[in-house]
Amino acid sequence: DSLYDSPRAINGRHNFTITGQRASGNVIYRGYISNPIRSLAADFHAYLSMANLIDNLIIDNDRFEAADRSGAAGVAGFPKHGVTTTQSVFWNNEGLSYPLDRPAIIRSDQYGWGYIVGTRGPAFRVALGVSERTAPEDYLEGEGLGASLQPQSLYVDQLERRLLREGKANRWEAVREGL
C-alpha cells in the first residue's frame, strides 16, 4: 500500500505502471501523465494488482489502462501478463487531450468489477472492454461530468471520514490545510 501525492511522469515508457499482487492498495492522487514513448499507456501492467485508486489524475496525450493482457507475451521465462487488476477505482480524472491513436483517457477491462466514476476536461471518454475472463463489464458513471461530482476526491473524503471517526479532528484540520 502506497500513497503517491502529485507525481508527474512525462515522456516515459508506461508513464506509471503498477505490477503484481504485492503492488495492491495503492493511491495515485493529483498526478499528471503526458506523452508516453511509442504510445505505451500508463497501466496496471501484469499479475493482478488489486484494489487501487487513481484519483484526480490529469491525463494529457496519454491513457491509463486496466486491462486483460493475457495475450502479452512473457519474456525470459516469466508467464504472460494475464489479468492486471480487479476492484480498482478511477475517480474524477481529467483529460486534457487524447493520444492520436486512442480516443479515450481510460481503458478498463478489469477482472470482476472495476469502477470508473467521473471524468472531466476536453478529453473525457472511457473505453470499456469485457471478455469471458473479465466479465461483467466494469461500472462507469459520470463520464464527462466530473466537475460536478461529489465528493471531488474519494481519497480526501475517506481520509476525512476516517480521521473524524477516530476523534482526530485537529489532525484532519492540519491535513486539510495541506490539500
Protein language model regions, located:
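Long, contiguous C-terminal flanking segments immediately downstream of a protein's structured core
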Residues: 91, 96-179
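Acidic/polar low-complexity surface segments
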Residues: 63-77
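Acidic/polar loop patches that form or flank catalytic/metal-binding clefts of enzymes
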Residues: 15, 39-40, 62-67, 97-106
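Right-handed parallel beta-helix
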Residues: 1-17, 22-38, 43, 48-61, ...
